[in-house]
Amino acid sequence: MKIITEFKGTYINAKANTGKTGNTYYQMSIDCNGDAGSISCTEDVYNLCQSGAVERFHDYIFTGELNTQYGSFRIRDVREQ
């Protein structure tokens, strides 16, 4: 089952890492109410951040997806408040 949630936070940075098998993994750093952390994100969200459409240290609304089948959480959308 997939559960969708939205929250407000401050975008800090996004990065891509390539694993040993050649798969690329995308993550973004977000500050939410004074707690900062790194969260997985989709390639589309990563590309949006790299294009400059999402500015560092600005506040946004993030859409997250919890996938209970795989026990994963990732950001699947970012939009202006």
Report residues per predicted region.
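A short, sequence-level motif marking secondary-structure junctions
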Residues: 42-48, 79-81
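OB-fold/S1-family single-stranded nucleic acid-binding modules
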Residues: 65-81
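Acidic, two-metal ion nucleic-acid-processing modules in DNA metabolism proteins
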Residues: 2-6, 26, 37, 60, ...
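OB-fold (S1/OB) nucleic-acid-binding surfaces
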Residues: 19-43
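Structural detector for short beta-strands of small beta-barrel domains
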Residues: 2-22
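OB-fold and OB-like beta-barrel modules that bind single-stranded nucleic acids
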Residues: 6-11, 57-66
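Short nucleic-acid-contacting surface segments enriched for D/E, G, S/T with interspersed K/R
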Residues: 45-63
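Short coil/turn motifs at secondary-structure junctions
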Residues: 14, 33, 67-69
